[in-house]
Curated annotation (Swiss-Prot):
It catalyses: 5'-deoxyadenosine + H2O + H(+) = 5'-deoxyinosine + NH4(+); S-adenosyl-L-homocysteine + H2O + H(+) = S-inosyl-L-homocysteine + NH4(+); S-methyl-5'-thioadenosine + H2O + H(+) = S-methyl-5'-thioinosine + NH4(+); adenosine + H2O + H(+) = inosine + NH4(+). Gene3D superfamilies: Metal-dependent hydrolases, Urease, subunit C, domain 1. This is 5'-deoxyadenosine deaminase. GO terms for biological process: S-adenosylmethionine biosynthetic process. It comes from the Archaea. Its cofactor is Zn(2+). The gene is dadD. The keyword Ribonucleoprotein does not apply. It comes from Methanosarcina mazei (strain ATCC BAA-159 / DSM 3647 / Goe1 / Go1 / JCM 11833 / OCM 88) (Methanosarcina frisia).
């Protein structure tokens, strides 16, 4: 007997070999997809009738800072330097481990509700984020942020903590947690330190999560310091490879794109954050054309201000149609691929498609809504019309985290109240 059967659904497999099934069935057993088709002879403990809904792979958020939910709306519409120096950094200096747990748990709740089943996170007090992931049932790739600032002692301490975290949590939560090394950025870490981090990651078989060329200021600073941009500096020290997740990649030259392609670097595109902070427009259309694996991220709530990947998909599609003056750029199905298949590839997880033998990470989207009627093209509706609030059911590793809009794994009201309290107390400490 199977664990879960989802029937009567429009099955958006994202598997190019299988295509979509207009009235299909998905069978789940022991955390994996065991059957996909029109009908099944199997019976199950739980049968979900998904008539009028789409079942699709869960969305993958490849760059965020979960605990920054506590900074949602805290400081907006400011110049970057003022935003960081007068608001975000002073607030982060007051963060406690308990704050990070409460903020991360709130982020997990928000992601469950909006259809994200897996995410990549880089921040501080990462044991607390890992505990939140464990409690929520989500899948995550986590890294402790390493910010050396050309201070050898600080770098050694950060790297020591990064190693401890990687080794302590790798494979935790029944394999749902993967760990990575998280050097913050080339303009906050020296080339010598970045080379050490790369070697540590190689020894531990872990990936690397790093911000790259998010701003023009970084580009100019790197050229002044090294006589070259971030991409070429990282390439020269042997940092790049398929194990690297590079967030933002806004200020890229054509030559930079070629380096990323040659080395198999995975890019996380964060369009809303880049627009809100006026960082610039990443050359995503060019990257995709040249075969770079580009996925989607939200960045932290301080610069987004939510974790809704449906909103991120629509924004990405529209931004690059506008920036290229080409209405055919980033069509709906390609953007869906960025949020599922490409994201799973970037994080090295057996997810992103609905395919027999793959992990059962999926969502059910309710299409019986005024703003989703009529429906001529399902991928188009998912990208241009749907939102995270249309997700009715979320499943990770074969476990139902939310069913028919009811979160099953967390006390929703308690999570919200405790996060609100943590945020208010944090701001009070900052202002005292």
């Amino acid at each position: 007997m199977a664990d879960i059967i989802i029937k009567n659904a429009y099955v958006l497999t994202m598997d190019p070999d299988a295509g979509d099934i207009k009235k299909g069935t998905v069978v789940i057993e022991d955390g994996k997809i065991t059957e996909i088709g029109v009908k099944t002879k199997e019976s199950a403990d739980t049968v979900i009738d998904a008539k009028g809904s789409v079942v699709m792979p869960g969305l993958v958020n490849t760059h965020t800072h979960a605990a920054m939910t506590l900074f949602r709306g805290y400081a907006d519409d400011l110049q970057l330097a003022e935003w960081l120096e007068k608001h975000i950094w002073p607030a982060e200096a007051q963060l406690t481990a308990e704050d990070v747990y409460r903020g991360s748990l709130l982020a997990c709740l928000e992601m469950i509700r909006s259809g994200t089943t897996s995410f990549a996170d880089m921040y501080f007090f990462m044991d607390e984020t890992a505990k939140a992931v464990e409690a929520s049932g989500l899948r995550a790739s986590l890294s402790h942020g390493l910010i050396e600032l050309w201070n050898e002692e600080k770098g050694e301490n950060d790297l020591k903590e990064g190693k401890r975290f990687v080794r302590a949590w790798q494979g935790a939560a029944k394999g749902r947690i993967k760990t990575m090394y998280g050097p913050h950025a080339p303009n906050t870490c020296s080339d010598e330190f970045l080379a050490k981090v790369k070697e540590a990651a190689r020894q531990d078989g872990a990936g690397l999560h790093i911000h790259v060329l998010e701003t023009e200021a970084e580009l100019l600073a790197m050229k002044e310091r090294y006589g070259k941009c971030s991409v070429h500096m990282l390439d020269d020290i042997g940092f790049f490879g398929p194990d690297v997740l590079a967030a933002h990649c806004v200020w890229l030259s054509d030559g930079d794109i070629e380096v990323l392609r040659e080395k198999g670097v995975n890019v996380s595109h964060n369009p809303i954050s880049n627009m809100k902070l006026a960082s610039g427009t990443a050359p995503v259309y060019k990257m995709l054309e040249r075969g770079v694996n580009v996925s989607l991220g939200t960045d932290g709530c301080a610069s987004n201000n939510n974790l809704d990947l449906f909103e991120e998909m629509k924004t990405a599609a529209l931004l690059h149609k506008l920036s290229t003056c080409n209405p055919t750029a980033l069509p709906a199905r390609q953007v869906l691929q960025m949020a599922t298949v490409n994201g799973a590839k970037a994080l090295g997880t057996e997810t992103g498609m609905l395919k027999t033998g793959m992990k059962a990470d999926m969502i059910i989207v309710d299409m019986k809504k005024p703003h989703l009627t009529p429906c001529f093209d399902v991928p188009s509706h998912l990208v241009y019309s749907a939102g995270g609030s249309d997700v009715r059911t979320t499943i990770v590793d074969g476990k139902i985290l939310m069913q028919d809009y009811r979160v099953m794994v967390l006390d929703e009201q308690k999570v919200i109240e405790e996060a609100q309290k943590a945020a208010e107390e944090l701001v009070a400490r900052v202002n005292s």
